[in-house]
Each structure stands twice: as structure tokens, then as C-alpha cells.
Regions:
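Amphipathic alpha-helical segments
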Residues: 14-29
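Short beta-strand micro-motifs in enzyme catalytic cores
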Residues: 38, 70, 112-116
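N-terminal beta-strand motif that seeds the catalytic metal site of vicinal oxygen chelate
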Residues: 1-16, 71-72, 76, 132-136
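Conserved short beta-strand elements that form part of the metal-binding/catalytic scaffold
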Residues: 29-66, 119, 125-130
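Helix-adjacent hinge/juxtasegments
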Residues: 61-80
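Short, conserved charged micro-motifs
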Residues: 17-18, 79-84
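Vicinal oxygen chelate
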Residues: 86, 91-136
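Short secondary-structure junctions
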Residues: 27-33, 93-98
């Protein structure tokens, strides 16, 4: 069996605003909001499910308002990378070459590809790269 990530829950202060920004930056569509999630379909096997309501999962209480920053990394093609970088720049958002340099307005070039990092709503750090991290 092939293992694929099916979905991940992204804590947000405002699930709709966070999902809309993510969809806009990545050139994706946000699904109509139903229930507690604002979903963005990333590809045929992955959705980013933005949630802004606390929930008690028996022994695991979960509150998006108290969740720390998460890091989400995406591998994309050159055309998608250029589009995402262009939309980040058009919004006047800071971006950079590394997780500790995500505001230096530089594009990292390593492993034969390009990488940028930038913060989105709720201070999550997104990484967009053109080469998989497992490549060399």
C-alpha cells in the first residue's frame, strides 16, 4: 500500500480568512465551508482543513487559539513556484531564503532548485520548494 497524507488540520484564528489566503497564494480553490472546516484542495489526495473552533477529543483537548506556529512545506514545479512567489510579492508579504531568514527577500538556491519561506495568518511558516527535500 502506498502511504499518502490525506488531510491535515491547520489551526487558525479565522478559518475562512486563512483558507482564502492560502488558496489565493497557491492558486487553488477553497471549497464551500461546511461544518467546522474551511477546506482547500491541494491535489487529488490532500486537503488543508482550516479550523478555528476548540474541540475536546476525549483525552486530547484542542484549541486553535492556543496552538503554536506550524511549518508546512510544499514541493511544486517551476511554473507554480513563480506564480506563488509572484502572488506573495504582489501582496507585499515578506519572504526569504530560510526558516530563520524568512524576511530577507531572497530566494534560496540549493540542491538544484529554489526555495522560499514566508509567514501566513496565524504565524504559520510555509515553505515552497522546487526540489523535494529527499533529493540528494
Amino acid at each position: 500500500m502506498t502511504i499518502r497524507l490525506d488531510h491535515t488540520i491547520v489551526p487558525a484564528r479565522d478559518k475562512v480568512a486563512a483558507a482564502q489566503l492560502f488558496a489565493e497564494l497557491f492558486g487553488l480553490e477553497m471549497k464551500p465551508v461546511q461544518g467546522r472546516f474551511a477546506q482547500v484542495v491541494v491535489n487529488d489526495s490532500l486537503t488543508m482543513d482550516f479550523a478555528d473552533e476548540a474541540e475536546d477529543w476525549d483525552t486530547i483537548p484542542w484549541d486553535p487559539a492556543k496552538t503554536e506556529s506550524h511549518h508546512y512545506a510544499f514541493c511544486v514545479g517551476d511554473e507554480e513556484f513563480d506564480g506563488i512567489l509572484g502572488r506573495v510579492k504582489a501582496k507585499g508579504m515578506a519572504y526569504g531564503s530560510g526558516p530563520r531568514a524568512h524576511r530577507d527577500r531572497q530566494v534560496s538556491e540549493r540542491r538544484g532548485g529554489r526555495t522560499i519561506y514566508f509567514e501566513v495568518l496565524d504565524t504559520h511558516l510555509l515553505e515552497v520548494r522546487t526540489q523535494p527535500s529527499m533529493a540528494g
